[in-house]
C-alpha cells in the first residue's frame, strides 16, 4: 500500500506542475486586439505590468 500511495502523490504533483506550466504558457501568448497589437496587462496589488508582445 505505501508504494501505491507514493505513486498517487507523484502523479498528483506532476498534474499540478503541468497545469501551472500550461497556464504560464497560455498567458505568454496574447490575442490580437482590433489594431493588430498584442499586449498583456497584469495588476498585482500595487504593481502594474504592461507587456507589449512584438510579432
Swiss-Prot record:
Q: Which domain of life is it from?
A: Viruses
Task: Give any Pfam family that matches.
Answer: DUF2729
For this entry, the protein name equals: Uncharacterized 6.3 kDa protein
Q: What is the lineage of its organism?
A: Viruses, Viruses incertae sedis, Naldaviricetes, Lefavirales, Baculoviridae
Amino acid at each position: 500500500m505505501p508504494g501505491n500511495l507514493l505513486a498517487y502523490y507523484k502523479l498528483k504533483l506532476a498534474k499540478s506542475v503541468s497545469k501551472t506550466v500550461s497556464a504560464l504558457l497560455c498567458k505568454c501568448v496574447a490575442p490580437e486586439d482590433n489594431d493588430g497589437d498584442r499586449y498583456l496587462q497584469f495588476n498585482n496589488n500595487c504593481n502594474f505590468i504592461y507587456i507589449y508582445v512584438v510579432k
